[in-house]
């Protein structure tokens, strides 16, 4: 908890020095995506264009939501598969507990879990749960997930010089091309 305490102390110093408040919301309570500038980097521009084609609320996700991230400590491949599957099955409960999105444009969202609605309609290739992507049990989860992500169209990649460029090539296609050229390390 020492690291957490240091992080919180640093955060509170910035908040205090800048007369800010911490709000525990999963979605910006007052503004829509058209009110918030997109981060001015090519990868975000490419993601934005992709999400406008592959979901209805990608702009909202990129500009108005916060993320919930969980780290696990694992001891084995089986441990990882079991924990990942159980955590994914518990995702709806976690979304309900931590999404905290009671307002949109300053008005009550009622019983709607707005943050979860946004993420469910962001990008069907990359979002949702494992079962939505035909991974229905923990047995062989890692291999089945790898098989799945090898078929997902890319958004951007690093070219030979390390620059971000757009792509719709899948990771599987990219790896085959690199192997064919003898460039796969």
Segments and roles (model prediction):
Residues 1-12, 17:
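Membrane helical hairpin/interfacial module
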Residues 13-17, 21-185:
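Loop-rich catalytic cores of soluble enzymes, especially ATP-dependent carboxylate-amine ligases
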């Amino acid at each position: 908890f020492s690291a957490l305490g240091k992080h919180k102390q640093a955060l509170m110093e910035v908040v205090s020095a800048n007369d800010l408040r911490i709000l525990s919301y999963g979605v910006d309570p007052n503004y829509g995506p058209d009110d918030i500038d997109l981060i001015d980097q090519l990868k975000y521009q490419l993601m934005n264009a992709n999400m406008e084609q592959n979901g209805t609320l990608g702009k909202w996700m990129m500009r108005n939501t916060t993320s919930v991230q969980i780290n696990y400590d694992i001891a084995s491949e089986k441990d990882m598969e079991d924990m990942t599957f159980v955590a994914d099955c518990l995702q709806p409960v976690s979304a309900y507990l931590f999404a905290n999105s009671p307002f949109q444009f300053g008005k009550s969202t009622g019983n709607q879990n707005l943050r979860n609605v946004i993420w469910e309609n962001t990008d069907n290739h990359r979002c949702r749960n494992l079962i939505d992507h035909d991974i229905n049990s923990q047995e062989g989860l890692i291999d089945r997930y790898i098989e799945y992500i090898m078929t997902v169209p890319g958004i951007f990649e690093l070219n030979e010089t390390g620059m971000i460029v757009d792509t719709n090539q899948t990771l599987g296609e990219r790896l085959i091309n690199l192997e064919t050229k003898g460039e796969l390390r």
